[in-house]
Amino acid sequence: MTENHDAIVTDAKSEGSGGCPVAHDRALHPTQGGGNRQWWPERLNLKILAKNPAVANPLDEDFDYAEAFKALDLAAVKRDIAEVLTTSQDWWPADFGNYGPLMIRMAWHSAGTYRISDGRGGAGAGQQRFAPLNSWPDNGNLDKARRLLWPVKKKYGQSISWADLLILTGNVALETMGFKTFGFGGGRADVWEAEEDVYWGPETTWLDDRRYTGDRELENPLGAVQMGLIYVNPEGPNGNPDPIAAARDIRETFRRMAMNDEETVALIAGGHTFGKTHGAGPADHVGADPEAASLEEQGLGWRSTYGTGKGADAITSGLEVTWTSTPTQWSNGFFKNLFEYEYELEQSPAGAHQWVAKNAPEIIPDAHDPSKKHRPRMLTTDLSLRFDPIYEPISRRFYENPEEFADAFARAWYKLTHRDMGPKSLYLGPEVPEETLLWQDPLPEREGELIDDADIAILKTKLLESGLSVSQLVTTAWASASTFRASDKRGGANGARIRLAPQRGWEVNDPDQLAQVLRTLENVQQEFNASSGAKKVSLADLIVLGGAAGVEKAAKEAGFEIQVPFTPGRVDATEEHTDVESFEALEPTADGFRNYLGKGNRLPAEYLLLDKANLLNLSAPEMTVLVGGLRVLGANHQQSQLGVFTKTPGVLTNDFFVNLLDMGTTWKATSEDQTTFEGRDAATGEVKWAGSRADLVFGSNSELRALAEVYASDDAKEKFVKDFVAAWHKVMDADRFDLV
């Protein structure tokens, strides 16, 4: 985190800044974007359910990145990276003759967009190459870091993704400057388009702040204090140089990135052991960001007219701070300078608030002139580590115990750069550590032999004879599996964590009913395992199998014999290996598939349904067929009748779509906030149905209505069942990485 923010561009709508995508004074050509979203900016954007399509991928259909990475000589790649780090280029000279600190910042900012609330952001897809991240003020001049790495990427081609290369380079930078890293796991496959499914904030101006309410309460799911920053403003909240106030921002933003206080101190101090910030002159010398720069800049941005515009004249954050006397060598120098000097406020050459050591010797080297020395300097957010009553004792302990600090930084850096990769089983390469960490949501080894087809048939019968209804079986399986997030590959049915805190107490899961269902399922499990010899069934498998049995029964009653695919092999997680606080972030505040809408949601239910479908990696047709099927199967929260547009609940029919599209029904809101509606017979006025926004949207939105019409057609009854089963199976197996 060696360069914290950028004071260059202040208006995302200004000419040349690549800001607001809507041209308010004219219609856009289709090649410019806009289109329907310009005319109706609040319409549902179903394109987020079709991201990274195969047609956008230039690689061969049979290309397997994991296999390509496994064949890579990682040591050779690291040697080539190391050579880049100490080979200064005239077009962007290296500070202190070493690009290592720049590359640490690049890797940090690639990973540091991750947030726990929805699992989005992070380094997993190499999104730093694309807008908006490539042009965020906080990522100023990281375009040069990536361009410096092009010779390495060019040499190894598709054997190493940009996503992996950015993080690996951060590790190599640390290692070549004397630090022992905790490890590295590859496996981050690149994508080929910018993400449109991440909400970065409500602001339309760089570095604006409209994301707080009340007593500085940061809007969910955001993880930064201002638009275009990774975490906090290094000058202090909204530029106010108050270390105590800044500490509050630091604690909240780092918490939202899954870091505790000790990890936060280690990361800030460790990152600021290296390199410097850049604020040689006024920000008005700096040009457009990469996305807005002219064609001839070839993807580079922030061209500066201040002096040479580079090296000693570089401007990025507007701050001019070097923290230690050995900025290209691992040391405890950050804490030494933090505690051994008193600091007074000053302004950088660019006019930014920073702190300089009082009456201190000039012990800090100049980045480009070996004859010059400087006094130690700190950012407002650095001083937070000394003056905040929680951070201070941690910082002092690290100062007095350098080995403990080094271990804490190594582990925190590893967590930072791998948090969004999912389970450890997905990590690739020879440098993956043996140690499994709690934040990786570990699962135990499977006990006993797998059940076979005969056992599966027996268990299905027992489940259907257990007294549990189709609704209960289906709802429990959905509640377990639908915790999965494709964003950071957390959650899912494997582990059966639905039986553990915090999931067993989540409001969306109807805790009382869930407890009853789990008791029954555990009885079936225990009875089977006691009489099955070496073969054992996990509760995780049994929950999913119960859902399959329920769906098959409902389909049969609709007149269709179908088998729901089921592959055993899930295991049951333990409380010891479940971080309750970490899993609290996965609690749904809404689940349109169960017609659940919790309190305090900013967006209407239909938007939240789309967001949930996106996190489950569903397409628009899959979302549509699942909603229609779950409604008639009675899978609603608290057995609500909202959206149950059928006279035969528990039977897998296409009634939801047939009755929603019936022109003999008129709809009217029944709540002031227009969250619930009733459908009346147009002729008699009799109330026929009740629905939510997550139901009526399938008749209201033109694209979703087109999908609903497919499933409402007379010839679609069997197709509906088959498509529902396929989409259901996809969700149930979303976290079965062992099957890929």
Swiss-Prot record:
Keywords (A to Z) from UniProt: Heme, Hydrogen peroxide, Iron, Metal-binding, Oxidoreductase, Peroxidase
GO molecular function, one term: catalase activity
Enzyme Commission number(s): 1.11.1.21
Organism whose genome encodes this protein: Streptomyces reticuli
Site-annotated residues for Transition state stabilizer: 105
Keyword presence, Lyase: no
UniProt feature, compositional bias: Basic and acidic residues: 1-14
Pfam families: peroxidase
A GO cellular component entry from the record: cytosol
HAMAP family assigned to the protein according to its UniProt record, in alphabetical order: Catal_peroxid (MF_01961)
Region Disordered, residue ranges: 1-21
Residues binding heme b, per UniProt: 272
Cofactor: heme b
The organism's place on the tree of life at top rank: Bacteria
Identification of the protein by name: Catalase-peroxidase
